[in-house]
């Protein structure tokens, strides 16, 4: 069991079929990362991800007191030009009330462990957030292009077995 910064129990779990928090999770992923009218995209993607709990894509939530306080997803591709790289970490989110308590770092570490369980040696992400991922051992390895043609930095980290940052 992990604990939040206020000492209350916190758990990180993969969304599974019939999860009672599924609807709330869809809403949070969509409202945080989606576009207006795009809820069906997230619901469909997340529903179909539930067919193989050991594969990708997979969606995860951090829960405290029955409230979703963080999210991330492991995806085959994060809608960018680098189709040769996989898997991708996407949708990393920490509730503003939980920021500063290392939940983001815990979710990043959890993602690396889950990536290794799926047989991958590394994980990728795109972000224009400078300095955040680097402090957790992620390396900038270049750029990808999104569907609008804009460049966005690519970050890479190894799973724990392959030498991921253990801090």
Where are the language model's segments positioned?
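Conserved glycine-rich acetyl-CoA-binding loop
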Residues: 82, 95-106, 118, 135
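Conserved GNAT acetyl-CoA-binding A-motif
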Residues: 115-127
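Active-site rim helix/loop that mediates acceptor-substrate recognition in acyltransferases
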Residues: 34-63, 69
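Conserved N-terminal entry element of GNAT/NAT acetyltransferase domains
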Residues: 1-24, 161-167
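Conserved beta-strand in the GNAT
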Residues: 61, 67-77, 88, 93
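Helix-loop element at the rim of GNAT/NAT acetyltransferase active sites that forms part
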Residues: 19, 26-40
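Conserved acetyl-CoA-binding loop-helix of GNAT-fold acetyltransferases
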Residues: 91-94, 100-113, 125
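C-terminal "cap" of GNAT-fold acetyltransferases
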Residues: 124-129, 143-167
């Amino acid at each position: 069991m992990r604990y939040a910064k206020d000492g209350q129990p916190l758990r990180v779990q993969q969304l599974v079929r019939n999860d009672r928090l599924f609807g709330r999770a869809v809403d949070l992923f969509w409202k945080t990362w989606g576009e207006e009218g795009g809820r069906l995209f997230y619901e469909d993607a997340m529903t179909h991800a539930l067919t193989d709990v050991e594969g990708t894509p997979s969606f995860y939530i951090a829960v405290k007191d029955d409230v979703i306080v963080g999210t991330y997803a492991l995806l085959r591709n994060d809608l960018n030009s680098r189709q040769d790289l996989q898997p991708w970490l996407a949708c990393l989110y920490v509730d503003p009330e939980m920021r500063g308590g290392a939940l983001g770092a815990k979710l990043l570490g959890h993602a690396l462990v889950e990536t290794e369980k799926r047989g991958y040696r590394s994980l990728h992400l795109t972000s224009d957030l400078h300095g955040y991922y680097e402090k957790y051992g992620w390396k900038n390895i270049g750029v990808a292009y999104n569907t609008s043609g804009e460049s966005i930095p690519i970050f890479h980290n190894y799973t724990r077995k392959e030498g991921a940052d253990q801090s």
